[in-house]
């Protein structure tokens, strides 16, 4: 009896996701997940909106103190986001508003 062609769940999910990787909504979801992962839920609650276009992440923040702190650590934050998204997206810049 021939053995069935079994594929791992990661391979199946990769094939399902592949056509959507270049869609703006999918890329924004990846950025939002990375933002939450790098900064935590407290900073996420103070983030009004995230936008992503042409490699640039724009974060609209509700907190002036958080904006000031993140601007001081902007390069480190950008590197952490790049590391988090290393296999999925290329980030070129981070704008904090």
PLM region spans:
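Short amphipathic beta-strand starts and helix->beta connectors
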Residues: 40-46
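Compact nucleic-acid interaction/catalytic patches
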Residues: 80
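N-terminal presequence-like segments and adjacent domain-start helices
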Residues: 1-37, 48-51, 68, 75, ...
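Short, aliphatic-rich beta-strand segments
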Residues: 55-62
């Amino acid at each position: 009896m021939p053995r069935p062609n079994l594929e791992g769940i990661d391979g199946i999910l990769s094939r399902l996701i592949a056509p959507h990787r270049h869609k703006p909504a999918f890329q924004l979801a990846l950025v939002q997940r990375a933002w939450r992962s790098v900064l935590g839920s407290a900073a996420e609650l103070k983030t009004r909106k995230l936008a992503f276009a042409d490699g640039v992440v724009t974060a609209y923040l509700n907190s002036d103190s958080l904006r000031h702190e993140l601007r001081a650590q902007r390069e480190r934050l950008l590197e952490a986001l790049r590391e988090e998204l290393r296999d999925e997206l290329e980030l070129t810049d981070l704008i904090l508003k």
